[in-house]
């Protein structure tokens, strides 16, 4: 990934995970004896099936995995769907399946009326190369038909409809279009398709004016192949709108005051009568008065000033936008709210529109409200709202403002916003910063007099006599379970990963301790499957991320993280939460290093590890923390690895000219600009100026576009200093920041397992294709040993 602001924004006792762990352990207890099992591998991680949420995201975000799914019920409640996705390493494909369940059969099994465990039927299965889901945006059209987006062994995504009773899914859109969003109302289909990106104007001239351009757009002006685009990059790709009526496209041109309508991260909502479409469209020019709206987290680079070109630039994923109303017959496009949508100011709530039955009113989420003399200016300029828009009267009625904090200090985020058209109830689900659990739920009911009342009523829930949920814990991937009021225990209904019963998974538990400053630290501790408390094991620290409610396969991310496959090699793995209390402060680097030291100390004190055999990996923003550790505490780690990350280095600073907020970020983290007297501060704080101090073998992986350039300073300095450094470069530079394609994941994650196995356990895989790799590493070991000998001679003298 290029240095973007998203990369820079990150947000001793064991205990048994209570209810979920208990019943999952019972469910898995029928597996074969341990002697018949084999260790967990990177391939197992890649090919594990996950029950995913197929709803298209309307949030500008970077996701490490697809969110966990839940049953999607048919309108008549007789069936429900689950969607699974897994990687197929041999084909380098993602495979997704839509599974159909009979609810009566499920209910009878959970109640004990039937001994037959329900077996779902696959009504659609697609696989394809690429970095985006093979199936997404799944929804019932009625109780017999399902619509969804899918890729059929092609990088292009089409709109399909499948009947649940017969036949194969049939495509509604052409095979050579990439459909990015859709909505269907009766015989009207609205969908958007990607506009093929073109090289920037003038970027391929013999002489190029570089003023105001960043080095990445200059060096990489040609668009990526569609199979190499990931969800993050799609956020900056424009889409065109199409309308089908009775299967034929209407000859309508959709234009705004700035030209042809182009949509980004489209959210489409057709009125029940098929006449109107609501979406969120970018603005070509910032309207007067929008400067008053406050960007979230004070990201002033996104301030909606009329002279802020970045606020409306295509490459800005948070570009300024607003809700608009489209007449699908005439093509007229008009603003629906004279205020910005919240997502353009980094308010990460779902951006949706829900029509009421009269086709005159619609609920709009995550939008700011216009500011006038009679309104509460502070609330309207700092918090987006949920409103009801009357398209005939062009009026807005607020329902509520979306909250960002929960006293005393809990940070809230909106997980989902749901509308029950039959119950006329709106539900807003909040999660907190302490984990993925729901922190708060708000419900609002539409009364007959068109007013809104906050209520505790439920919305669109499964029948009370049967409760279904998708659950997982650290040691078990997602499964479908059910419970009825007459039974206290949950019943395992369906496990999409029976193959893992023949794999030794080992144990992952929560682990917490305090550092020397009294800060509470926490992480997830993965132990080798044959863990012996009398043995002190090597340790690998994986910083950045902590989710105790999700199956632990890799760790926080897929790029470079070894996770459970590392533990299977006899190495303790600590997935360590990165505290952000010192983020963008001059002592951030030293604070994070103290965290690493405290983890090593506590694990050694508790008898888990050998403090002399510890490795660490850095990814994305935590590469800076790893480099800070090996330059300022050179004896702390036996080996280190960094992948596609932020170095907070002099060279990265210069490369970031005219590229977002990166330089400002580095100046705050170091405490000065790297010029004049400020360079002295960089000399002491930036890792790149202190590589002469390191003795730790370092592996650098450069997988994304521009990473060879960004990481060259690290490699060049260490190489010049004759330090033990190795660097691998993905020549195509076609990987996303968070790896998705099975082949790329295997390359990155298996190299992590190999690297730490070599340095911490002296192990080499007996694979002829890795001969050159181990030859290089043995040479690095010689360099390290010579360096240690030289240091010893100096100390003795």
Language-model-detected regions and their locations in the chain:
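N-terminal secretory signal peptides that target proteins for export/translocation
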Residues: 1-11
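Bacterial N-terminal signal peptides
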Residues: 13-25
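Beta-propeller folds
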Residues: 27-466, 474-476, 483, 707, ...
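Non-catalytic accessory segments flanking enzyme active sites
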Residues: 69-71, 276-281, 287, 441, ...
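Hydrophobic/aromatic beta-strand patches that form the interior of the parallel beta-sheet core
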Residues: 190, 278, 468, 481, ...
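Glycine-rich His-Gly loop
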Residues: 282, 367, 472, 542-546, ...
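Cap/lid segment of the alpha/beta-hydrolase catalytic domain
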Residues: 494-612, 619
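Active-site-proximal cap/loop segments of hydrolase catalytic domains
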Residues: 559-569, 573-797
